[in-house]
UniProtKB/Swiss-Prot annotation:
Main localization category: membrane
Lineage, top ranks: Bacteria, Bacillati, Bacillota, Bacilli, Bacillales
Coiled coil: none
Leader sequence residues: 1-25
Designated name of the protein: Kinase-associated lipoprotein B
Source organism: Bacillus subtilis (strain 168)
Disulfide bond residue pairs: none
Gene: kapB
N-palmitoyl cysteine lipid attachment residues: C26
Lipid positions (S-diacylglycerol cysteine): C26
Length: 128
């Protein structure tokens, strides 16, 4: 049974990222959510070995793009009642929050994650 309707503005948890989006379709097991803003940037590295740097493949995870649609299971979608921020500003804030946490951490995993974040920010914000 669906709790939300098409057009509802929600907070969706997708992998390790958190997004504000609009429901564009209700399906039996999930909602199709169109991304409007980023609340939490996805974590970097191997999700099967969290916070470990010495892994065979250290994943670079991008935030979902503005307008990108993704399937999110019903139980991972919550109501969102606030104002929807500008996508680019929300992405800047989410990456800044992640950077601050990683700088505090100081582990090898955090250093590798910061390296990935540097690359992603150049791509996101067209920095040289």
């Amino acid at each position: 049974m669906s709790t939300f309707e098409t057009g509802s503005i929600v907070k969706g948890f997708y992998k390790t990222g958190v997004y504000i989006g609009e429901i564009t379709a209700c399906r039996p097991q999930h909602y199709l959510v169109k991304v409007k803003a980023v609340l939490t940037h996805p974590a970097q590295g191997d999700l099967h070995h969290p916070k470990q740097a010495d892994v065979p493949f250290f994943h670079e995870r991008k935030a979902l793009a503005y307008g990108e649609q993704t399937n999110i299971p019903h139980h991972m979608v919550k109501p969102y009642d606030g104002e929807v921020p500008d996508y680019t500003e929300s992405l800047r804030e989410a990456t800044a929050q992640m950077r601050a946490k990683l700088n505090e951490d100081g582990s090898e995993w955090a250093k590798r994650s910061l390296h990935n974040l540097d690359i992603l920010e150049k791509e996101y914000f067209n920095r040289p």
